[in-house]
């Protein structure tokens, strides 16, 4: 079976593991998944991320984060730009997620960054996902 949207699969695996309160999950590695995982870690949505090399493409191990009373830190993840319908924004159209409570992950000419960083650098790009 050929996977048509590995980013959507990655986000769905995080969402599903988060819903059943798993501590970790593993996904096949790629550069964009690594970048997304690093953003989620930097923004405080996940506890940690590890890269495990193997003979093939490698594995990304994501350590999920929960609050004091086991409440989920990630409420939801939503894929925006899809293979069948890409979503691009100009620098002045970069979206705010829940009035700044969430983040938009954007692929730009300067790499994968958050909506706040895109606004600060005044660049647009492809909106990959919303996380809140």
Swiss-Prot record:
Disulfide pairings: none
User: What domain of life does the UniProt record list for this protein's source?
Assistant: Bacteria
| GO MF annotations in UniProt | rRNA binding; structural constituent of ribosome
Q: Which BP terms in the Gene Ontology apply to this protein?
A: translation
Keywords recorded for this protein, A-Z: Ribonucleoprotein, Ribosomal protein, RNA-binding, rRNA-binding
Stored InterPro entries? Ribosomal_uS8 (IPR000630), Ribosomal_uS8_CS (IPR047863), Ribosomal_uS8_sf (IPR035987)
**Keyword field contains RNA-binding:** yes
* Keyword flag Ribonucleoprotein: yes
Q: Name one GO cellular component term.
A: ribosome
Role description: One of the primary rRNA binding proteins, it binds directly to 16S rRNA central domain where it helps coordinate assembly of the platform of the 30S subunit.
Q: Which family does it belong to?
A: Belongs to the universal ribosomal protein uS8 family.
Q: How does it assemble?
A: Part of the 30S ribosomal subunit. Contacts proteins S5 and S12.
The entry's protein name is: Small ribosomal subunit protein uS8
Species of origin: Enterococcus faecalis (strain ATCC 700802 / V583)
Q: Source organism lineage?
A: Bacteria, Bacillati, Bacillota, Bacilli, Lactobacillales
